[in-house]
Regions:
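Active-site catalytic microenvironments in core metabolic enzymes, especially phosphate/sugar-handling
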Residues: 1-252
Length: 252
C-alpha cells in the first residue's frame, strides 16, 4: 500500500512534468482514495478502462490520455460526465501524463519505439526543445521500403499506412508517437529517409511526396501503449503496489 500523493510527487519529479507546456493537466486529475494498493494503466481513460478498474478493484487509473484538454467545454456532462461520475462513485483516482510520458528518456513512448525498432544514435527531432518530444534514430543497416514497412507492422501489430516518397532505402528515421504527423516537416529538415507517427491526415500524402520523406502511420494507440506500462512498473518497484495494463485494441 502507498500514499496517493507520494506517488504523484514521485511521478511529477521523475517525469519533470512541470517543465512541459501541455494540452491538458499532467498528474492528478481526479482524486479518489488516498491509499493505493492497485493501479490499472491504460492508454486512454475510456469508459471501458474505468469499468476494468472498477472490476479489478483498482484505486488508481493511470493513463496517457486523460481529461480537461484545452478547448474542451467546461460543463462535466454527457459522456465525459458519465466517466467522471463512475470514477468518483468508486473512489478511483485518475492520473494522466501526456507529453512528459512521450519524452522521458527511459520510461517514455518514444524511447520504447526506438528500442522496439533497434534504432541507434538517437538525436532530437527538434533541436530547439528542452525536452525533445520526437527523435531521430538510425537503423544498423539500410532497409528497402517494403522491408521497413514489414518491420513496422510486425513491431506494432498494426496495419501500417505508408505514404511514399522517392527514396529507395531507409536508414535515418524520425519518429514521434501519437498524433504528430505534422512533424514530418521537421524530419525533412533533418534529412530523414522516413518519419513515423501514429495518425495520418489528408495533407500528409502530399507532404511526404513533396518533402521526400516516407511517412508511416503506425497507430496513435499502438504507438502509445508503452509509456503507461513502463511508468506503472516503475511505480510498482518504487512503492508497494500492484499494477496491471488494460488493453483495448483501438484500430486508430
Amino acid at each position: 500500500m502507498a500514499n496517493l500523493h507520494e506517488i504523484i510527487q514521485w511521478c511529477d519529479q521523475t517525469l519533470k512534468a512541470a517543465e512541459f507546456k501541455d494540452y491538458a493537466p499532467n498528474g492528478l486529475q481526479i482524486e479518489g482514495s488516498t491509499e493505493v494498493k492497485r493501479i490499472l494503466c491504460a492508454v486512454t481513460a475510456s469508459e471501458d478502462a474505468i469499468d476494468a478498474a472498477i472490476a479489478q478493484n483498482a484505486d488508481l487509473l493511470l493513463v496517457h490520455h486523460g481529461y480537461f484538454w484545452k478547448g474542451e467545454p467546461y460543463p462535466i456532462t454527457g459522456m465525459r460526465g458519465n466517466r467522471i461520475k463512475k470514477l468518483i462513485q468508486n473512489n478511483i483516482s485518475l492520473v494522466a501524463y501526456h507529453l512528459p510520458l512521450d519524452a522521458h528518456p527511459s520510461l517514455g513512448n518514444n524511447i520504447a519505439i526506438a528500442e522496439k525498432l533497434n534504432l541507434q544514435n538517437l538525436e532530437p527531432l527538434d533541436l530547439t526543445e528542452k525536452h525533445p518530444i520526437g527523435n531521430i534514430g538510425y537503423l544498423e543497416q539500410a532497409l528497402s521500403v517494403d522491408d521497413f514497412k514489414a518491420k513496422l507492422q510486425n513491431s506494432f501489430d498494426f496495419k501500417v499506412i505508408h505514404l511514399p516518397a522517392e527514396k529507395k532505402t531507409i536508414q535515418k528515421v524520425g519518429f514521434c508517437t501519437g498524433g504528430a504527423q505534422d512533424f514530418i516537416a521537421k524530419a525533412a529538415l533533418q534529412n530523414c529517409d522516413a518519419y513515423i507517427s501514429g495518425e495520418v491526415s489528408e495533407r500528409t500524402f502530399y507532404e511526404a511526396k513533396e518533402l521526400g520523406v516516407h511517412y508511416f502511420a503506425c497507430g496513435h494507440h499502438a504507438t502509445e501503449r508503452y509509456g503507461v506500462q513502463r511508468l506503472a512498473q516503475a511505480i510498482s518497484q518504487q512503492f508497494t503496489v500492484e499494477s496491471e495494463y488494460f488493453e483495448l485494441n483501438n484500430p486508430i
